[in-house]
């Protein structure tokens, strides 16, 4: 069974170079090496990493992210809090949708810049990732758009995610 950190690792592998190491991933995504190592094993067992290679099976990853992630990791919302905006409240979805005036979904973070409704991230280091790696942060917010958005938000998030995954596969 995949875990939230597996999705974070998978997304990072999709946008990074093929010369990654567990140590470099640890430094980039703020997930301990032991957790990354176990995550890589689960990703390989799930057929998302090609056996014995450092390549993501992009077709399977896209299928997982677009069709299954919302069921595997249903949104867990909390109360009003300060945090980092996600889903439709963050780039790139924010640029495609009109502001509804409601409190936005945020990953709880005391250093966050926005007041909104807490949304538990796929992995606890998501707010830190958003400060370190804008490209990965965008993929995580698109994934959250798929997890928590209505049909319109999900449709736009799926389209943007597919475009980014397609360009990552071509690189």
Placement of each model-derived feature along the sequence:
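Short alpha-helical segments that sit at the start of domains
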Residues: 1-12
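Exposed, interaction-prone assembly regions rather than primary DNA-binding/catalytic cores
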Residues: 74-159
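Short amphipathic alpha-helical interaction segments
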Residues: 30-45
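Accessory beta->alpha helical hairpin/"wing" motif in late/C-terminal subdomains of nucleic-acid enzymes
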Residues: 53-69
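Short helix-to-turn junction characteristic of helix-turn-helix DNA-binding domains
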Residues: 13-17
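N-terminal, charged low-complexity regulatory/assembly segments
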Residues: 163-171
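A short, conserved structural fragment
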Residues: 44-55
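Short acidic, hydrophobic short linear motifs in intrinsically disordered regions
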Residues: 18-28
């Amino acid at each position: 069974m995949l875990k939230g950190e597996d999705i974070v690792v998978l997304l990072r592998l999709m946008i990074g170079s093929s010369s990654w190491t567990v140590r470099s991933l640890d430094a980039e995504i703020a997930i301990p090496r032991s957790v990354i190592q176990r995550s890589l094993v689960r990703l390989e067992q799930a057929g998302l990493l090609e056996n014995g290679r450092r390549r993501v099976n992009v077709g399977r990853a896209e299928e997982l992210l677009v069709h299954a992630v919302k069921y595997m990791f249903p949104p867990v919302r909390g109360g009003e809090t300060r945090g980092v905006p996600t889903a439709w409240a963050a780039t790139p979805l924010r640029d495609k949708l009109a502001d509804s005036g409601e409190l936005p979904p945020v990953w709880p973070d005391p250093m966050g810049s926005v007041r909104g409704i807490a949304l538990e991230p796929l992995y606890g280091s998501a707010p830190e990732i958003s400060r370190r790696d804008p490209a990965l942060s965008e993929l995580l917010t698109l994934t959250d758009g798929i997890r928590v958005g209505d049909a319109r938000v999900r449709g736009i998030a799926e389209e943007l995610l597919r475009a980014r995954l397609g360009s990552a596969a071509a690189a």
